[in-house]
A protein has these predicted regions:
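N-terminal glycine-/charge-rich "phosphate-binding" loop or analogous flexible N-terminal tail
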Residues: 1-75
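Structural motif
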Residues: 76-77, 98
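Short His-centered aromatic/hydrophobic patch
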Residues: 82
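A short helix->loop->beta-strand "cap" motif at the edges of active sites that frequently abuts
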Residues: 93-98, 117-119
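ADP-ribose/adenylate-binding Rossmann-like module
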Residues: 96-108
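Rossmann-fold NAD(P)-binding glycine/threonine-rich loop
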Residues: 107-119
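Phosphate-binding beta-alpha-beta segment of Rossmann-like dinucleotide-binding domains, i.e.
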Residues: 117, 125-177
């Protein structure tokens, strides 16, 4: 079984993460992993523009990499993160049994074409759960302690010495019940 991994050469994360678990993936029915770099986004001057266009228009505006088109012909699984998965790619993958998006969204995959061709598409919806939880707790602490307001005041040359958010006595007592 062949898994084609199309990775972003500018992002070491995807490739390093896969390399770290490659030995586990190899245990799956003699899975052969083939890595191909996706250079489509490098044609754009700004990767941010690429991502915005992908979110608005989907992947059909890109031209798949020739090496991807060659390697997908006999691939059973397509794994990707930022690479656009077009109808042409899906149709070229005559043996494709699964498209795995290593991200939380679907925007860079032509899911409609995959469905028409009977190829399941899965993603990682919980991929960002931990960082989102971290940010939520951090924002709650910032709000409870008035950190952003205090920062804004200091940057404006002000310092409110009567700031209840930084009064440790108030902070310690504010949640107590009598």
């Amino acid at each position: 079984m062949k898994a084609l991994v199309v990775y972003d050469p500018k992002s070491k994360f995807t490739l390093e993460a896969l390399k770290a678990v490659e030995y586990k993936l190899a245990e799956l029915e003699n899975l052969e992993l083939v890595y191909v770099a996706d250079h489509n986004h490098e044609r754009m001057e700004n990767p941010k523009e690429y991502n915005l266009k992908m979110e608005k228009e989907g992947p059909e505006w890109i031209t798949p990499e020739p090496e991807v088109m060659e390697q997908i012909k006999d691939a059973d699984i397509l794994m990707t993160s930022f690479c656009g998965v077009t109808r042409a790619m899906l149709e070229a993958g005559k043996n494709l049994k699964l498209v795995f998006m290593m991200r939380s969204g679907w925007e860079n995959c032509n899911v409609k074409a995959a469905k028409e061709l009977g190829i399941p598409v899965c993603n990682c919806p919980s991929r960002l759960a931990e960082p989102v939880a971290d940010l939520t707790v951090a924002m709650m602490i910032c709000e409870c302690r008035g950190i952003l307001r205090g920062n804004r005041d200091i940057l404006n040359g002000e310092w409110n010495q009567n700031d209840i958010y930084n009064d440790t006595t108030n902070a310690a007592l504010c949640n107590l019940r009598i």
